[in-house]
Amino acid sequence: MATAASAIEYSSVKSIAGPLLIVEGVEGAAYGEIVEVICPDGEKRMGQVLEAREGLAVVQVFEGTTGLSTKDTRVRFTGRTAKIGVSMEMLGRIFNGAGKPIDGGPEIVPEKELDINGYPLNPVSRKVPSDFIQTGISTIDGMNTLVRGQKLPIFSGSGLPHNQLAAQIARQAKVRGEGEKFAVVFAAMGITSEEANFFMEEFRKTGALERAVVFINLADDPAIERILTPRIALTVAEYLAYEKDMHVLVILTDMTNYCEALREISAARNEVPGRRGYPGYMYTDLATIYERAGRVKGRTGTITQIPILTMPDDDITHPIPDLTGYITEGQIVLSRELHRKGIYPPVDVLPSLSRLAGNGQGPGKTREDHKKVVNQAYAAYAEGRSLRDLVAVVGEEALTDRDRAYLKFADEFEDKFVRQGKDEDRSIEETLDLLWELLAILPEEELKRVDRELIEKYHPKYRKK
């Protein structure tokens, strides 16, 4: 139902501040309400109410306020919140950050319209995330297993290949099992035109676009559109998952650009800043995005999230990765040191963690040896890494044969396991077999974290017999 304000067109714009209009004398306006801004030349722009109090409404104009004046600008309140029309026709299409097609195809004929803010899930109705999602990336599938319904962010840094990794995951991700329907929803926020062309070309040339819905918000698009983009993407994901029984992987990049837009809008509203100038409600705002991942009782479909963010100055204690870590279930950390060595993807498995990995590992999901062999590989790699520091002090000549074996394991682990081609799609079986081949570098008596029967079944020494 329209509010009282929706019946009236206001010409009482009090002031213009950056992308914001302050309209006075407004009655019945609601937070999040969509408004129509009529420019002096008759052009119509869209906006959204950010604040409504004591007869004042603060409106963020999607297309910016250039050319507007306080005298001749009119504002009409629609009484509606932001919605997007959804349909299965969206698969295989590319949209801008506001949900408009930019691939030259026809407009989408919506099956229904959904509020982009979604609907809160009762915690009791949630199911524990489980079941393996294969990305084809060994450091994720093997060491930091992703499961359906999980939210697992990638912490990157400026200049690291997170875009290439995001595109590779979007191309290769799949769920195992007969008759399972899978889709990818990809949302890029605040990226350059060059990056946008890279993503669109990657999806088109590999055929991955057929099962994907792509949203692209460019760096020169309005900040408010950047705030809407992940919510629009997740609304489409919820439609595919909960109404079409699909398993949906949502990739959001770059959440740092999203948070910068949040800070920009907060500053324009003269809000009291929190840590490093970001609004004090950033934690809550991020939670409204991340918490839309999950599994729901009685529904077949699932929503899994991989948010990607660049850590300013590679600082993992920065508010954006810090708050993201509180809400999500682990993190994949990209390493500048590995990148300098020419290793792709430069995933540092030691600070990386998937808190729900155990729910997707083991018989019937991956393989019976998964948990044990990964634990052994973690311990061996950590030992080898610590020995590198020792070698820098005393030299390799001072090492025992055992130490040299661990040092060799660490080098081979990075060169053969972590390093992967940008088009190399490894199955989980290939990933686990590769771990066993690397563990064969160590003396057998060092494999204390793996059961004897697993060693005799999977160790290369016994498999060759």
UniProtKB/Swiss-Prot annotation:
Source organism per UniProt: Methanocaldococcus jannaschii (strain ATCC 43067 / DSM 2661 / JAL-1 / JCM 10045 / NBRC 100440)
Record note on pH: Optimum pH is 6.0 for ATP hydrolysis.
Function of the protein: Component of the A-type ATP synthase that produces ATP from ADP in the presence of a proton gradient across the membrane. The B chain is a regulatory subunit.
Domain of life: Archaea
Alphabetized UniProt keyword annotations: ATP synthesis, Cell membrane, Hydrogen ion transport, Ion transport, Membrane, Transport
Pfam families, sorted: ATP-synt_ab, ATP-synt_ab_N, ATP-synt_VA_C
High-level lineage: Archaea, Methanobacteriati, Methanobacteriota, Methanomada group, Methanococci
CDD domains: ATP-synt_V_A-type_beta_C, ATP-synt_V_A-type_beta_N, V_A-ATPase_B
UniProt free text on domains: Purified ATP synthase is 25.9 nm long. The hydrophilic A1 domain is 9.4 X 11.5 nm, the central stalk is 8.0 X 3.9 nm and the membrane-bound A0 domain is 6.4 X 10.6 nm; the domains are connected by two stalks. ATP is synthesized or hydrolyzed by the A1 domain while ion translocation occurs via the A0 domain.
Quaternary structure annotation from Swiss-Prot or TrEMBL: The A-type ATPase is composed of subunits A(3), B(3), C, D, E(1 or 2), F, H(2), I and proteolipid K(x).
Any GO molecular function: ATP binding
Gene name in the database record: atpB
Cited PANTHER family: V-TYPE PROTON ATPASE SUBUNIT B
Subcellular location: Cell membrane
Membrane topology recorded in Swiss-Prot or TrEMBL: Peripheral membrane protein
Name of the protein this chain belongs to: A-type ATP synthase subunit B
GO biological process, one term: proton motive force-driven plasma membrane ATP synthesis
Family: Belongs to the ATPase alpha/beta chains family.
One annotated Gene Ontology cellular component of this protein: proton-transporting two-sector ATPase complex, catalytic domain
Biophysicochemical property: temperature dependence: Optimum temperature is 80 degrees Celsius.
